[in-house]
Every structure is written in structure tokens, then in C-alpha cells.
Amino acid sequence: MQKWIQRLANISAIGMFLILAMGALVTKADAGRGCGDEWPLCHGKFVPAHTISSFIEYSHRLVVGVVTLVLIATFYLVFRYVKRNDAKFYITMTVVMTLIQAAMGALAVIWPQSSLVLALHFGLSLLAFAFSLLLALVFTSFGQFLPQKRISSGFKTLVWGTTIYSYIVVYLGAYVRHTTSTGGCTGWPLCNGEVIPELKGATGIVFTHRIAALLLFLCILALYLQARRHYQGSDKLWFGSRWALITVSLQVISGAVVTWSMGNETAYLFTGMIHAMIVACMFGFLCYLCVLTLNDRKA
């Protein structure tokens, strides 16, 4: 039974990752209204007409439905056969976040909402993926969340502060997409050919996100340097901080590629999905470090 639970946990994490990526595609392709103002039907049908926008939106809905069924099965088996309280917490939070984002998605179709609320939809998807990833890790060698070395309070503060700040940066990125402000800054690293552009409208929104992303990179770089200096002998802390730096570096690069590809619609959609997927991985590694700091208190 343990192997079945592990497989379902892995499928859940993969499914949540796919939902997050497809949600980013829905936003980038402006397909959120691809099924009109109907839910769960799409233009009055279970199988909609084969337009691009309806196909993207309906595929996203279908994947959410299938993954939700997998989560329910995983939830039952974890509470029935797994004794670890952290596993029960992770699957509970995954299910809760998935249900909330599904409800928000349905409401967004029926009653159009502000960009501030729509951006939160991606944030909830990110949390759902992070919890599902932690659940999957429970059944691996990384799932024994006790670090090999005591962690200083300063490092713990840096980990948690960086993780919370990363969520804010991700929210700003989602807000950029939902306000269709991406074109506010043409070119990278300069914005409209300027180091500091006129901070109005879409340009101000995009430039704020860029500065926030730069500060996030510096925070994770500081996290990595501290881990290398003090915790290189701890495989788990070293693993999490190293991959957090790798993914935030890829995030910066992919953000630049998204800007450069704005003239090509296909490339723009593809790079936007890649950017969202890298963001999810980065946040997942930061959450893993947070769990290590929590369990250090019990060591």
C-alpha cells in the first residue's frame, strides 16, 4: 500500500505542476473566456467546439478535474495508512488550495473579477504545488526533514524572509500578466531603452516587477552563500539552497527571453509557460528549506 500512496503522491505533484503551467498558458493566451461565461460546460457543451481558446481553457478544466480525483484518493489513503502528521498536513493543504483555486476559477468565468483577485489564483496554484511536492518528498530520502546540522536563527530568518518575499514577487508577476502590462517594458535589461523609465501605467508595473525580481535573486544568492559557508556539510540544506539559486537564475533568464519573444506569439506563449514552471520549482525548493528549519527546532 505504501508504494501505491507514493505513486499517487508523485502523480499529484506532477498534476499540480501541470495545472500551474496550463493556468499560465490560459492567461498568456487570453483564453480565460474561451468557454464564455459558463462553468462547468463550455459554450453549453461537455465537449466544446475546437477553437484554440476553448481547447486551452477546457483542457485546463479537465486536468484540474482529473487531478482533484487523484488528490481525493491520495487524501483518503494518507489518512488511512500513513502515520506521519506532516504528510497528512501536506495533502490536506494541497486539497484545500486546489478546491479554493478551482472555485475561484469558476467564479472568474461566471463573474469577471479584478486583476488583483485573478493574480491570486496563480498564487494559490503555487501553494498547492508546493504542498504536493513536499508530500511527494515525504516518501523519498529527502523526506526525513531533519537537517544534519543545527541551523542558526539568522539563517532561518533569511530562509523564511526570502520565501515570503518570493511569493510577493510571484504575485507581482501574475499581476503583470493579468493586467496585460508585459509590453510596458520593451527590451531587456533596459526598459524602453532606459535604465529607469517613466514609472507610469504598464511600464511602472513591469519595472516594479523587474526590480523586485532582481532583489529576490540577491536574497537567494545571499542564502546560497550562507549555506555554502556554514552548511556545506549538510546535504539537504546545501541541496535546497543550491537549486534555489539555479532556478532563480533560470527565472531571470527566462524572464528576459519572454520579453525578447513578444513579437512572436507562439514563442511568447511557450516561454511564458517555461517561466511559470521555473518559478514553481524555485518556490518549491524554498519551501523545502523552510520545512528543514521548522524541523530543526525538534532536533
Regions of interest found by a model, annotated:
Residues 1-299:
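Polytopic transmembrane helical bundles with strong interfacial aromatic enrichment
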